[in-house]
Amino acid sequence: MFKLRTHNKQKKEQTIDKKALIFGLISVFLCGIGFGIIAPVVPFLVQPYTRNLREQAIVVTLLISVYAFCVFFAAPGLGALSDRYGRRPVLLVCLLGSAMGYLIFGIGGALWILFAGRIIEGITGGDISTIFAYFADITPSNQRTKYFGWVSAVAGAGTVIGPTLGGLLAKFGYSVPMYVGAGVTLLNAVYGFFFMPESHHKNNRIKRITFVRLNPFTQLASILSMKNLKRILISAFLLWIPAGSLQGIISQFVIDVFSWTPALIGLIFSIIGIQDILSQAFIMPKLLKKLSDAQIAMLGMVSEIIAYGFIAVSALLSLYPVFIIGMFIFGFGDSIFGPSFNGMVSKSVDSSEQGRVQGGSQSIQALARIIGPIIGGLIYVSLGHAAPAFMGVLLVGAALVVLYNGVCVNK
């Protein structure tokens, strides 16, 4: 088998299994399409079960929060299971569950069915921790941030195609993108069944799973007790709250402020995906040569603060060009923060703990994405369309201070 070769500082040869790398990237790409394809139509699927736009906005954000709530509880368990039994079986089961969740959401018929679909998606959506653990297994630590950047770029490619495709498919019915999303995710599972190699060798696996590893709260307490991770995770938590709010309200926002259709809503997510690709292809490699992971993360935070400012102005003045500029800037900040954050986290522990730490990290992100959409939805309907963006400026500013102080303390 052809292998990509890398070398560590001790000149000990390390190899990256090309087959594993290709599977991982294709899997992330298909996941990006599956997620993105449904994004433009969620408010329209909710509309028949609500009485007004205010109620519709609340339900849409609750659907996002329910998904994140399930990820919060599932991610540590999935990470622990992958540390014990390997990444392959966990990923396959999660992909099948996600396909089922999309299908149920598309069938609909009642509001509780939509929530049931999101719950199933959320329980199996914790597989993102296993995907990052998978890449941590197959990449040397000194190149891990670069490969996490590849993951971000490939996911970005999926989120370019997915929302655009979802917006076009919505012309044939708002449920059609959900069915196609289920099909794409199922295709990913079939591909993985035949071509995915196991990345987590048996001699690196944990011997047993304790309750502590399955409990998200004890897991969080354990991870936050690690001094080298605490400030990193707290800063990310503060950043993810407004990001969750933006994710939860953005489709409703452009409907209310700009009267956009599903096809135009798909454009929003495509912008973020395009920015991901451009950043990872042209910007991130140069940044990695000159800056540390922490410095890149802080640059991403500054970009997001500026982006939220543009989004707030677009809401106040109803100017969609300003909104689009803000989304490009947000996409840049998000695209460089994610790989640098995951690089910092993965380099903090050894291979036997990757699933646990990535699972805990995803739980923190999920917790923020539970809180974010709820707060964002409430202030959106009570304080105005610009309020969630102003919240983003304040919280990401606080996150920047936390991470900066953490970097200075470590030095």
Q: Can you describe what each PLM-predicted range is?
A:
Residues 74-86, 279-293, 380:
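Helix-to-loop junctions at the C-terminal end of transmembrane segments
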Residues 117-156:
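Cytoplasmic helix-loop-helix junction between adjacent transmembrane helices
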Residues 73-109:
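Conserved MFS/SLC helix-loop-helix module at the cytosolic interface between two early adjacent transmembrane helices
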Residues 5-18, 197-235, 257:
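Juxtamembrane intracellular "pre-TM" segments in multi-pass secondary transporters
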Residues 41-57, 248-265:
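Short amphipathic helix-loop junctions that connect adjacent transmembrane helices
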Residues 170-183, 378-396:
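A membrane-interface helix-boundary motif in multi-pass transporters
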Residues 62-78, 270-283:
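Central cavity-lining transmembrane alpha-helices of secondary-active solute carriers
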Residues 96-109, 303-317:
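C-terminal ends and interior cores of transmembrane alpha-helices
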